[in-house]
Amino acid sequence: LPSTFASWWEFKRLFKILRRRDAILQGAPDAVKKVNVFGFLWQAHGLFRRPMKVTMLTALDLKSNPFLHRITRASGFIANKILRGNYRWQTLSAPFTIHLEGLNVNAFEEFESGALLRDMKDESELYKKINEPDFRAQFKEHVSAIFTVGLWHRDFSDGWITDCPDASLIGKNFEEIGQTYGVDAVDAYFDLATKHKDALRWKTNYG
């Protein structure tokens, strides 16, 4: 979207127009840092001026952020009751399910080792990389980190196989498969991705 590259100064010019016309701004928190939500919240206030109608669209990922529903309610209270604004949240009415193939996972961009995989263009080098012990150790460290940013919960027990040349694996998650073979869930995922590549189809939920 063009607004992705807009400066906050450009946004402020837009806000003036929207406020004058009593129009509605539909925005979204930054997918990784999320700090821009406070800027939108402040712009909605109606202290000594007309409030701007703001609605924030989010996947409301309760898996990676279990207290997110409290944050949204608190922010709404602050914006509407204390700051006299007109601030609303839009969320999905059902879990945000994404379907994936092999290593083709956009959410890998949210952490260093995953971004490295996303940047690799040579397929042979890609599969060579995920079988390096040092890389796997680094990937596991990033996946299990306590303090993370981004949308993905990084929980491979919620990675469910929907299609695979080995039909016996369909309907199982990577943690279950790892336990069967006595390996970590990440190892199970990388091993299956190496063996089946994009024929390994799986899904996970963001909310």
Language-model-derived ranges and their functions:
Residues S3-K16, I24, A28-G207:
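Active-site neighborhoods of metal-dependent hydrolases
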